[in-house]
C-alpha cells in the first residue's frame, strides 16, 4: 500500500480526475418500477420535481472534476438521449471535456445486445481506449446520492489497488438485493457474493451487511485485460457483480471504499444518503422525503449543485377560483409552470407544468410533468405519470380494491396511474 503525505495527497486528488473517464451504465429497464419505465429507461425517470435520476451521477462527475464522461444506453433510450443532449451539452470539447453517448450497436461478431454490465463496457472498448485514460470509473446511472469521486480515486491509488468498489452498510434483511462483500480490517475484499440468499453480516454488526453500491474504479489497462478475458470465458454472464469482482478477490487486487469517506453532505449529523429507487414504494418515499422540513438529501447545497436541463418556464402560481377558494400548498415541492386553482396540495411533489383545477385535494402524491387534474378530484398516495389527464371527480388512493382494479397498486399501497390505464378505463 502506497502512503502519501497530506500535501502530496491534496495534489494527487486534484490531478486524478483529469486522468479519469467515467462510464455511466444507463441502459437498464428498471422493471420493478412497472409501467413507469414502459416508455423510458430507469435513469431517465423524473425525480425531485425537476430532475432525472441520471442527473445525480452526471453532476457528481462534474463536481468531482471528472469531465470526460461516457453514457452507455440501450433500453428505451430516446428520452434519455434527448435529455442529455438538451441539458448536458455545455462541456468544452476544446478542453477535452465531453458527455459521449454510447448506444448499443451490436459491435462484436456475435451481433447481440448488451448481455450484462461488463459486456456493455466490453462492446465499447475500441471507443474507451481512444479516451486514453489511466483510470476508469464505472457508475450506475439509476441511483440517488452525492459523492466526491476524487476522494475514492485517491483511496484507490494510495492502496495500490487494481480495482476499488464503493460500499455501504445495508440492513441484513435487504442484503439479498445487493452484491455483498467480506473485507479485512483495512478494507481489502476477501469475498464477494452477488445477491446471496443468506448475506454474511459485518463482523461486530450482525444487523447489517456490507453492500456494493455499483460504483467501481479500475486501472484502465487492467480493466481492458479483464474484459477481454471475461468475453472469452464460456458460461460467463458478463456482469461486474456476478463475474468480474468475485474472481478478483482471489487475486487480492480489489479493495472496498466506504461511502462515508466520500459522501457529500451539508449536515454531518445525517447518515450518508444513497438510494436505489428501484421500486415504486422506494421511488415514492425518496421523492416525498425532499418535501419534508429537513430532508435527508440536501438539494439546496450550492457547493454541490445537481444540474439538469432547465426549461424556460414561468413561476408556479396559486390562484383562487371563481367561488373565492384559494389554491394553497403545505410541505410540498411545486415546480415551474404549475398552476393550482382553488385546491389544496399537501406533502406532495408537482413536476413542471402541472395543472390542478378547483376543489381538489392532493395528498402525499407525485404528479409528473404535464399532468392535468380535473375539478373535485381527491388523490392520495399516488404517482401520476407524465401527461395524464385525471377526469373530473375521480378519487384515487382511498379504496384499495378499486385502485387495484383500475390501476397498479404497490405492496406499500402506492397507486401508479398511466395514460394507458386511464384510456382502458375510459373505454369500458
Swiss-Prot record:
GO terms for biological process: glycogen biosynthetic process. Pathway: Glycan biosynthesis; glycogen biosynthesis. Its EC number is 2.7.7.27. Disulfide bonds: none annotated. Alpha-D-glucose 1-phosphate binds at residues 114, 179, 194-195, 212. It comes from the Bacteria. Belongs to the bacterial/plant glucose-1-phosphate adenylyltransferase family. This is Glucose-1-phosphate adenylyltransferase. It comes from Yersinia pseudotuberculosis serotype O:1b (strain IP 31758).
